[in-house]
Amino acid sequence: MRYGDTHKAETHAKLVRLAGRVLREKGPQNLTVAALMQAAGLTHGGFYAHFKSKDALLVEALESVFEESGQTLHSVTDGLPPRHALARYIDVYMAPAHRDNPSAGCPIVALNSELPRQSRKFRTAFDVGVKLLLGKLAGWIKAAGSTEGEALAASVLSAMAGAVAVSRAISDKRLSNELLGAARASIKARLGLSEVVL
C-alpha cells in the first residue's frame, strides 16, 4: 500500500503524542517501544523509521508535552491582563481536573521524581521546559507590580507543582481537595490575587 506524502510525518506526530501521554501517566521507565507501537497500530520494527532510539523518542515526547502545556497556558490566559492571567493559571493548574488527569497534565508534576534516572538530554529538555514556564510566570508577576519576578516565580511554581503532586498521592478525595484549595488560596494570597475575580 502506498501512503501519501504526509503519512510519515503524521505517524511520527501520533507516536510522539502517545508517548507524551504515557510519559506523564506512567513515567519513562514504563514506556516500552513494543507497547507504544501496538497502541499506534504499528509493528515494532517500524519504530526505527521514526526515532534513532527510545531516548530520542523520550526527549521529543517531553519537548512536545511542554509545548502542549504552553499551549494550554496560552489558551486559558489569552487576552487577560497579567494579574488575571496569573490568577486564572493558578486556578486551572491547581484544580481537581488537573490532579485527576496526569496523562494530560503538567510534565513537572508527573516527572520531577524521574529526572535523576534519565539521560542528560532528557534532563536538559526538562530544564528548558521549566525555564520557559518560569519565564512566563515571572513576566506576569513583574507586570502585576512585583520586583522579585524570577525568585517569586520559582517559589510559586514549586509550591503549585508540589501541591498537585501531594494531592495526587492522597487517596482521600476530600482531603486531597482541601489540600489543593488551601494551597491555591495561600499562593494567590501571597501574590495579592485573593480579590481577583475571573
Placement of each model-derived feature along the sequence:
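Hydrophobic alpha-helical connector segments
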Residues: 60, 74-105, 153-156
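Helix-loop "lid/cap" segments that line or gate small-molecule binding pockets
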Residues: 95-98, 107-117
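Short, structured helix-loop boundary elements
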Residues: 12-13, 33, 55, 59, ...
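Hydrophobic/aromatic-rich alpha-helical bundle segments in the mid-to-C-terminal region
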Residues: 119-128, 132, 141-198
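N-terminal intrinsically disordered/low-complexity leader segments
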Residues: 1-10, 193-198
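Helix-turn-helix
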Residues: 14, 18-56, 60
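Short, basic, alpha-helical segments at the C-terminal edge of helix-turn-helix-like DNA-binding modules
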Residues: 63-69
